[in-house]
């Protein structure tokens, strides 16, 4: 007999979309009657033959006064406490939407915005990879609501929270966030098998991945391979004990950053330093930027931190009493798995306590402890087609939202030529399944990249093209990324720009489209560019012209409400603005002083 339960999202702290009917769902014995008592009314539903029920609650006005929903079924009672009615948003995408508020901490900045608004709540859906083509859950298999004034608030989506805070400060209505973001997920990971099969591009992969036991077999193979690699490192490492004991094995003298090429295995770094007299050692942190791939860090032979992969910043708290007057040693091992690694350029390496610093840039000894063969990367399931559809994306279809916010595209840089098609299909299919024309606000990728291969420029161009989809908007984020970090910390401004787009699209009903170049008028020696609204040029280094496939920089200047380009070589095949991977200093701005999207035009 099926026990009476409510789906996980219908739990304490729930925010329901105002002014529309909401269906509250769960499970009960087939034929059982479920009743809801709320606000003096009673509403009912009956469980179907599969033991599922959908109980319709009529639309309610916005309310910041917490209330209770009381359910009864077969002698059992369930109560959802602390329920609000406001505006609910589906936030999704990759790690930059997933990135929690705690990861936006910048130890070199005095500004750190902490969440503190009880009217903003997030439901974090579990990330569950699934390649079964027939699996499509009606409800999330877990999850809970977090209030932004609670202990767990630092793990809420930073971009999502700052979006919600900006919006809440304007409209003063409770905000709910349903977060299905998954680091590294591709746009095709959020589409069902039958849609992916329409294109033919994914058939070979789907034939393999949809076979029973794919995840289990692949995981076992990966773990076996990675386990053998780790055991080889541990068995061959003869430097750990002497370095941690304070001995000084010979090695290469280096300063940070360090790039290691054509090497897989383990490297040790160590450095001795004097603790300055009067240095406030209590509360100190060891700051080592980011590295590739895995590190374990020590102060005076005691482990203070460990990070298993390349992306997170190495901010390690040093236990009080570990730093001592006089000589100290900082050391860390670095495991390089795939043939290239090192300590990332452009970061700051130091011990910090309050406003006091001990610089750690130079004076390191680098010792190669173990050399191995490059390891084959483990399978990153959630970056694959279909992976986060059936158990992570599909359960959102039955919920009511004000809009969807998506920050996604990094994983699709390698196939940017397909992105417009796949993103458009994602939006179309999502709207068809949820049954209404949900507004969709995308986040264009910011600047990033050590090597300019053009992949992110092409992806941004595809994202701009996706703005042709009706009832969509896009926040332009160049200028607030970090060239040497895939996860820039300025999510406050990301959230603010998303809120501006959302307000225009979903509230003011004016529509919202990024500023576009609407015309090119060629003159002797140059061209006049006109735009969909007045623009302001604050530099001239980002305009280029293409002649016979060769890209040449051209001078630009303000002319009226547009831009004039000097073209001494005549009419080009194409004109580009900021069309490269890392345009970190935007030069063209709209009437709101927001950056204009990179573009190209014939």
Predicted features, each with a name:
Residues 3-4, 9-84, 338-342:
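Ser/Thr-rich low-complexity repeats and stalk/linker segments
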Residues 3-4, 77-147, 179-259, 327-401:
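An acidic-aromatic loop/edge-strand motif
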Residues 8, 16-21, 261-265, 285, ...:
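Surface beta-strand/loop "capping" patches
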Residues 25, 273, 277-301, 330-332:
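Aromatic-lined ligand-binding clefts that engage carbohydrates, nucleic acids, or primary amines
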Residues 40-63, 290, 297-350:
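Beta-strand-rich ligand-recognition modules
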Residues 42, 532-602:
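C-terminal beta-sandwich/jelly-roll accessory domains of carbohydrate-active enzymes
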Residues 64-74, 329-332, 573-579:
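Short, aromatic- and glycine-rich surface loops/edge beta-strands on solvent-exposed regions
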Residues 204-210, 218-251, 460-521, 539:
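Catalytic cores of secreted or luminal carbohydrate-active enzymes
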